Amino acid sequence: MGVYNTLALESGGITGPEMFAPGEVVVDENGRMTGLLKETACTYMWDKVIYTEEEFMKSFKAANDILLSYGVTSMHDGSFYGEETIGLYQEACRSRLIKVRMYNLLYHAYGKKKTIEWVNRFISTGIHGGLGDDHFRLGHVKILIDGSTSGPSCATTEPYSHDPNLKGIQLYTQEEADDIIIKAHNAGFNVSAHAVGDAAVNVILTSIERAMAQNPRPCRHRIEHCGIINEELLARIKKAGIVPIPNPGFFNENAEIYVKYYGDRVNYMFPLKSYLDNGIIAALGSDSPVIEADPMIGLYGAMTRSDKCSGTVAGQGQCIGIMDAIRMYTYNGAYASLEEDIKGSIEPGKLADLVVLSENILETPVEKIKSVKADMTVIDGEIVYER
């Protein structure tokens, strides 16, 4: 989400809430725009700002340096920012301006219409996911089904606990999701979707199930966030072999408001313990820049699910231990990008990507995990960061 003044709204051509899905352009009691834009209304405005190649490259370098300082050696990037950025990303990785290995989801950050056009163009080329090398790879086709847990704007089947009139924002109908997901699946792509609320998770699950029924083939589809689910959705995720990508670091920032917004549903929110108990391979991510990219925040969130300000715990029964959390960040992350044969664990024959931490996190008290630092980051056997 983002806040824009009157001049920015006028310059961007946003004239009223009717231009987008209900709830994306926030209005006051008199129906006037407040300046708060959510989801595709917000990303629509991103397209109105033009960056130079030099500005892009500077931002790539800055992001790379931040990730290396956190000990991150591989990342999954959720979107491209305009057609020109795919080539810039590739060049930055080729020249090693970006040293962190990049697995890129095929999603256009400037909204639904752009994403559909973007995905159709990739499908029409005849290529499919996995194109690239160990430093820059094109991966899953991705769409964005709903909003966020913190908005709150994720699409839920039941109203929010704090407001019986709200059930979030759903950006794709079932038919629209079916069209793009089945098309991408048939073209040989693995598919993914940003789906947070249980209503949104049901949409993407249904599309994937229909795609797999029409065209059974080896695949490794995934759901980004997969925030609020239930036993029925959990069983369907397992049956389809889907990889959920939960973000436990969110609890560090939002556990208190999660309890307010979703009530007892927090017991199946980013349900890491349930994934483990059911043999579902889930990979943890930060969702940076929504929160910091520091994996220590995610590890802490996975183990405590507690709010850093109030101490509120959201769904304590879903807490997991340190070794399981580490595996979800490392091996499972590689599994989510179909690269577990070359990275995700330290063993002979795999890429020499390592991090040396300031202390042994297997012995560090849970309450101190967030203070652990990366002392050294190594990629391809080269020291790329030292504290």
Where are these regions (language model features)?
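Divalent metal-binding segments
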Residues: 1-123, 139, 143-200, 219-220, ...
